[in-house]
């Protein structure tokens, strides 16, 4: 195809100290859908990842198990690869940060930075475990928060009041490793001169390489002042030694992102690809990182600064996503919702999760809720009842009455053209990572396809001998519409698409969507997808509970997060109690956004044109800071107070109030509803 693009796509590196869970899978599914879509469009895409295999937790866990760190990370890598393959994640290479490629690139980049005067040294004071004879990283110290006096808090931040501090400030600290009271020791550490890159980073922040929410967060960091970054750790430590030093190692977060380069270098060495073409400073290729919101700090500040300092190219874009919650709350081991990928795979088709995540994913940094009841309902409703049923209800007639041969012309050319015409819109949604919009549009088409079959009623036509040609045309048309739909869904449901290709006897490509299957044989129809049963979910939950109930309860230091939504927030107190009669006075309605635009003269207001089913309303809402691209709200459902008296404002009439949650300003989130809601529905 013309304008063929060359891309390198990465996912954040899973830590080699634990199993893959459904939180990890959100990112890898999101990236894989995007990669598969780009490949369908004819672009050249390389998709790589690796295990993040260094750090104190791995060293200690290996010692606890009586094995070497190398043995521990080898097993983790094999397990991770097996899980990703089972979920149909189409990596071209999956490597490890504990590799010769990573050692060589990390060492070379460090020496470049050092020789440019970008590595500084100074003596710092640290907590030291006198029993284990080791310096203690922040998360290996616990004590009482110096700000709010909450007990049992980690050495870098308080999960009660959200304060950050030095582990030296903890009250009554103790070592998570041994329980001993740490002492203070001094050590020379090595620092990357991040402030030297502030001007470059400010320019890069506004270059379009970051989501607006990340750019806003970076502005806060700039205002707070950039600090030199400690890139060293003291022995004992599992990682790469720093050249020309004794008992000093690179901090895991220095060599972890370099793992992207190392994994690609490994692929290049095996396949003959040109490594420099993708990483040289003036590269014409594209580089994309899919990451979680908790590691934005490292990827948006340290990583581009390191690349700039080493005369390497910077990412084309960084795509961050939120966390996974289950039934509205944080994943829980005790409730059985901290589900490992391997547990899920024993009981449920991986494509069920791929579809559900896709149906909810958008380009914003929002947490995604895996509602287990909705999961079952949506998979069965969309994939089984709508999509697969469309094929099966027509295929039986084609096989039995027409020897598997499709008609030689389209029964409804206008309907075919309507389906094909949506290819560009669906492609735009995939490109923008607005998978929820793509799925919504595809399912709208699926409803139209099933309505076509319902209206034509081939089961009635089949009973009339003189309508054989009509039966052939109608059922062939139904199969043709199914072909278009499954083509659109191929990036999301690759295994279902493969089974559909075997049935249709053709390859599903983006460039042949507009080419109908005329006078072509299809294979005898076989079941394409099985219904998802609630009992399968129940088995996953129970097995997860059992898995963690048998594991010893030991303290596991957590990876620090710079954008941690799981910390307890400053929640506003509950308002004064009201009666049910008071609540009944509110008429809350579902509304669909017809058009949303900024009010140019206002710093706060967006103007909404809303569909309430039987009429339209205009509402002015002060959420401009939270939604910098108001046009992206078009088509969304919102909840509004419909019986609020109209209010004449400076910028126009506001006929109601749209509901949102948050503390105000940029921290506001529109409320919406579940699948199936329609404009005008009353909220009860």
Curated annotation (Swiss-Prot):
Residues 582-684 form the tRNA-binding domain. It is an enzyme of class 6 (ligase). ATP binds at residue 333. GO terms for biological process: methionyl-tRNA aminoacylation. It comes from the Bacteria. Its main location: cytoplasm. It is found in: Cytoplasm. This is Methionine--tRNA ligase. One of its GO terms (molecular function) is tRNA binding. A motif ('HIGH' region) lies at residues 14-24. Its EC number is 6.1.1.10. Binds 1 zinc ion per subunit. Homodimer. NCBIfam families: metG, metG_C_term, PRK00133.1. PANTHER family: METHIONINE--TRNA LIGASE (PTHR45765), METHIONINE--TRNA LIGASE, CYTOPLASMIC (PTHR45765:SF1). The keyword ATP-binding applies. Belongs to the class-I aminoacyl-tRNA synthetase family. MetG type 1 subfamily. GO terms for cellular component: cytosol. A motif ('KMSKS' region) lies at residues 330-334. Zn(2+) binds at residues 145, 148, 158, 161. Is required not only for elongation of protein synthesis but also for the initiation of all mRNA translation through initiator tRNA(fMet) aminoacylation. Its cofactor is Zn(2+). Keywords: Aminoacyl-tRNA synthetase, ATP-binding, Cytoplasm, Ligase, Metal-binding, Nucleotide-binding, Protein biosynthesis, RNA-binding, tRNA-binding, Zinc. It holds the Pfam family Anticodon_3. It catalyses: tRNA(Met) + L-methionine + ATP = L-methionyl-tRNA(Met) + AMP + diphosphate.
């Amino acid at each position: 195809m013309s304008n063929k693009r060359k891309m390198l796509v990465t996912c954040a590196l899973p830590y080699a100290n634990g199993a893959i869970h459904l939180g990890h899978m959100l990112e890898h599914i999101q990236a894989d859908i995007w990669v598969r879509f780009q490949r369908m469009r004819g672009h050249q895409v390389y998709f790589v990842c690796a295990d993040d295999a260094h750090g104190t937790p791995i060293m200690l866990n290996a010692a606890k198990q009586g094995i070497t760190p190398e043995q521990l990370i080898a097993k983790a890598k094999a397990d991770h690869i097996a899980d990703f393959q089972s979920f149909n994640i189409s990596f071209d290479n999956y490597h490890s940060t504990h590799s010769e490629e990573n050692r060589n690139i990390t060492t070379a980049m460090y020496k470049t930075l050092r020789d440019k005067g970008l590595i500084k040294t100074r003596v710092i004071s640290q907590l030291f475990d006198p029993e284990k004879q080791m310096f203690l990283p922040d998360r290996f110290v616990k004590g009482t928060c110096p700000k709010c006096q909450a007990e049992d808090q980690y050495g870098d931040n308080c999960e009660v009041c959200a304060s950050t501090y030095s582990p030296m400030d903890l009250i009554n600290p103790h070592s998570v490793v041994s329980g001993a009271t740490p002492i203070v020791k001094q050590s020379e550490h090595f620092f990357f001169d991040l402030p030297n890159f502030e001007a470059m980073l400010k320019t890069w922040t506004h270059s379009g390489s970051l989501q607006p929410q990340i750019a806003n967060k970076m502005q806060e960091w700039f205002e707070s002042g950039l600090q030199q970054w400690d890139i060293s750790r003291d022995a004992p430590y599992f990682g790469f030694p720093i050249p020309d030093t004794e008992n000093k190692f690179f901090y895991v977060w220095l060599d972890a992102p370099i793992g992207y380069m190392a994994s690609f270098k490994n692929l290049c060495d095996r396949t003959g690809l040109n490594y420099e073409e993708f990483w040289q400073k003036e590269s014409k290729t594209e580089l994309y990182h899919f990451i979680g919101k908790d590691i934005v700090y490292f990827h948006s500040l340290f990583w581009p600064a390191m690349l700039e300092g080493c005369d390497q190219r910077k990412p084309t874009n960084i795509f961050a996503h939120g966390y996974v919650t289950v039934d509205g709350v944080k994943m829980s081991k005790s409730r059985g919702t901290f589900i490992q990928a391997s547990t899920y795979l024993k009981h449920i088709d991986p494509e069920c999760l791929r579809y559900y995540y896709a149906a909810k994913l958008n380009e914003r940094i929002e947490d995604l809720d895996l509602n287990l009841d909705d999961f079952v309902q949506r998979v069965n409703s969309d994939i089984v009842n709508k999509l697969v049923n469309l094929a099966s209800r027509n295929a039986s007639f084609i096989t039995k009455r027409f020897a598997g041969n499709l008609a030689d012309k389209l029964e409804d050319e206008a309907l075919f053209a309507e389906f094909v015409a949506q290819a560009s819109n669906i492609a735009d949604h995939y490109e923008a990572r607005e998978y929820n919009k793509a799925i919504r549009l595809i399912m709208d088409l699926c409803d139209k396809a099933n309505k076509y079959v319902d209206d034509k009623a081939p089961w009635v036509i089949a009973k009339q001998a003189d309508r054989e040609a009509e039966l052939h045309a109608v059922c062939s048309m139904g199969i043709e519409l199914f072909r278009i739909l499954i083509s659109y869904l191929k990036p999301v449901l690759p295994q279902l698409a493969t089974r559909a290709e075997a049935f249709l006897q053709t390859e599903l490509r983006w460039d042949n969507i507009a080419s109908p299957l005329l006078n072509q044989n299809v294979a005898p129809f076989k079941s394409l997808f099985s219904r998802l049963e609630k009992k399968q979910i129940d088995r996953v939950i129970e097995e997860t509970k059992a898995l963690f109930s048998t594991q010893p309860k030991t303290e596991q230091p957590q990876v620090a997060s710079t954008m941690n939504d799981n910390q307890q927030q400053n929640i506003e107190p509950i308002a004064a109690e009201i009666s049910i009669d008071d609540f009944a006075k509110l008429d809350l309605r579902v509304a669909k956004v017809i058009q949303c635009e900024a009010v140019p003269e206002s710093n706060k207001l967006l103007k909404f044109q809303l569909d309430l089913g039987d009429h339209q309303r205009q509402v002015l809402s002060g959420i401009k800071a939270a939604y910098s691209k108001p046009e992206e709200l078009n088509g969304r459902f919102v909840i509004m107070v419909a019986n609020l008296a109209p209010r004449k404002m400076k910028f126009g009439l506001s006929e109601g109030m749209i509901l949102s949650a948050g503390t105000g300003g940029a921290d506001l989130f529109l409320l919406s509803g579940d699948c199936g809601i329609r404009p005008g529905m009353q909220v009860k």
